[in-house]
């Protein structure tokens, strides 16, 4: 999808307002004060520097973990948001985590319930939400 309307119409996505910081042949950076992170894409986007833009993330593309990523920098996070698990919805083989970020946003992450004894996050746990560059949707309107 290229618009916020379509992204939300075809499924639930978390959408953040951002601004294009840099665009080069193989890398683009979008900063988002609303999200509290930088979105780094390993591709060129159809935008110019300083352009207002939106980014979207699908819940099933967001990885949730209690472990801090090795390259996590709290002063300049990249493709990662820290938060607290506020709610968990169990739906058969899936769990949807509702994570509140420091900016007050609620981000949903969906995870499979494959292992019963796995160390899944629980209510009030501090967690890190990460995603791969190719899973960032760039929305132009």
Residue ranges of model-derived segments:
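Conserved beta-strand-loop-alpha-helix hinge in the C-terminal portion
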Residues: 1-11
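Non-catalytic connector elements of ABC transporters
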Residues: 13-15, 22-141
